[in-house]
């Protein structure tokens, strides 16, 4: 395996594939923090040239974390479809890129072949794509999943209604929930991040969600994003629950820092299929985000895009209903500004869809990042073109509990209006029955949450 190239009379030599992958990555402050990034733009180009000639077999044989040491690697490798892999193992990363972008290659073709790709292959081809490549390629791929309703259908754009509250006050949560529903948010999930991470608090909020859902016959899913073990305990104690949530990482060490293992998720899935309130079969919800592994020193000298791709490979094993990157949540230490956040959002969405998971995006930023609401709206617009399954919906885009900025109720509504997309069909019909939508457009009643009081 020759890992060197000469550009303009200068020879660049790379130590191993891991270094090639890291230095081929677009500029990210997280990679600089980890001392993995290319030192110059010229070195980045050289790494991309070398990576383009690497074969998929070489990438499979050199996972970011050794098979013997890491259950994430083992799940990714063991789940691989061998006939598909054998067909393409001699391809270079450049060959894979050209095949994906070829106008004759369909979304169905990509979905079929993706079962033969490891996460390192997915990350590698992502690094050779420009932003428009990522949009064009992702838009080809359609990934659906079913919980109570089906997300990801052609012509739909969904929204997670996130009615977070600083004290978990049920009435405050309800006010945000009703307002969001009246704007057409919530078809992906009614999902709250609780202040108090306990089974008792999760159960209390889940019961309020279920009460509202049943009273108005709302076709959607409910979830409280406490720790997976707290949610499991709540379900075991009889709380209604459609989805169990967990933040995930791209290494076993990262997941252990989050307080769980693959076995925990297997148990959570089995519990939901036995005692959950959803139809299924997709009953899990995962969130990711570039750089989380570095925070727990669980990145194994691997760049943040490659580790993020491994999150999606890990997620695929559990057939989740929802997966989304929380793209700018960690802050400027890992994604410095709007340009880096935009790039990361497009990368994550493409890698998730290429891996085969139902992919959304929390287009967001922290208040100490060089980004603003316009930048996040730009990213949401680009991801809508890329066929993103869902965004977040928070009152005015300002999460007063988590202290970060994201998309509000109006953004998804506006993007649906611009593109002619709708909510999930059953939810769209509910909006029409309630008078919030007429002939595909929001009515004057939209935004009036008081109309849902009872």
PLM regions and their residue ranges:
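Anaerobic metallocofactor- and corrinoid-dependent redox/one-carbon enzyme cores
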Residues: 1-174, 182, 189-454
């Amino acid at each position: 395996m020759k890992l060197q190239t000469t550009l303009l009379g200068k020879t660049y030599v790379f130590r191993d594939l891991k270094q090639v992958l890291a230095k081929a990555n677009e500029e990210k402050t997280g990679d600089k923090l980890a001392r993995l990034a290319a030192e110059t733009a010229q070195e980045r180009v050289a790494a991309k040239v070398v990576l383009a000639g690497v074969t998929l077999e070489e990438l499979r044989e050199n996972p970011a974390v050794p098979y013997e040491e890491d259950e994430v690697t083992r799940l990714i490798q063991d789940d691989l479809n061998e006939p598909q892999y054998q067909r393409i193992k001699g391809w270079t990363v450049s060959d894979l890129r050209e095949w994906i972008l070829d106008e004759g290659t369909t979304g169905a073709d990509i979905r079929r072949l993706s079962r033969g790709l490891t996460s390192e292959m997915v990350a590698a081809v992502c690094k050779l794509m420009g932003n428009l490549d990522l949009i064009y390629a992702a838009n080809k791929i359609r990934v659906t999943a079913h919980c109570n309703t089906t997300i990801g259908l052609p012509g739909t754009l969904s929204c997670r209604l996130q009615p977070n509250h600083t004290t978990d006050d049920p009435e405050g949560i309800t006010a945000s929930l009703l307002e969001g529903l009246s704007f057409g948010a919530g078809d992906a999930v009614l999902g709250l991040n609780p202040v108090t991470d306990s089974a008792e608090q999760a159960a209390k909020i889940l019961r309020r969600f279920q009460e509202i859902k049943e009273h108005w016959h709302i076709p959607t899913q409910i979830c409280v994003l406490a720790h997976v073990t707290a949610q499991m305990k709540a379900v075991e104690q009889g709380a209604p629950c459609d989805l169990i949530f967990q933040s995930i990482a791209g290494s076993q060490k990262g997941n252990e820092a989050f307080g769980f293992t693959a076995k925990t998720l297997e148990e959570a899935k089995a519990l939901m299929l036995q005692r959950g309130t959803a139809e299924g079969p997709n009953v899990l919800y995962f969130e990711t985000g570039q750089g989380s592994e570095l925070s727990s020193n669980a990145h194994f000298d691997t760049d943040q895009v490659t580790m993020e791709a491994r999150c999606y490979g890990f997620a695929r094993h559990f057939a989740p209903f929802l997966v989304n990157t929380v793209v700018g949540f960690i802050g400027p230490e890992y994604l410095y500004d709007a340009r880096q956040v935009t790039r990361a959002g497009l990368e994550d969405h493409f890698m998730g869809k290429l891996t085969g998971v139902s992919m959304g995006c929390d287009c967001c930023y922290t208040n100490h990042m060089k980004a603003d609401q316009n930048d996040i709206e730009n990213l949401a617009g680009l991801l809508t073109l890329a066929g993103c399954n869902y965004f977040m919906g928070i009152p005015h885009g300002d999460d007063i509990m988590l202290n970060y900025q994201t998309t509000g109720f109006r953004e998804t509504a506006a993007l649906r209006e611009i593109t002619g997309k709708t909510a999930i069909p059953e939810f769209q019909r509910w909006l029409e029955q309630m008078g919030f939508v007429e002939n595909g457009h929001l009515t004057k009643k939209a935004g009036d949450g008081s109309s849902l009081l009872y």
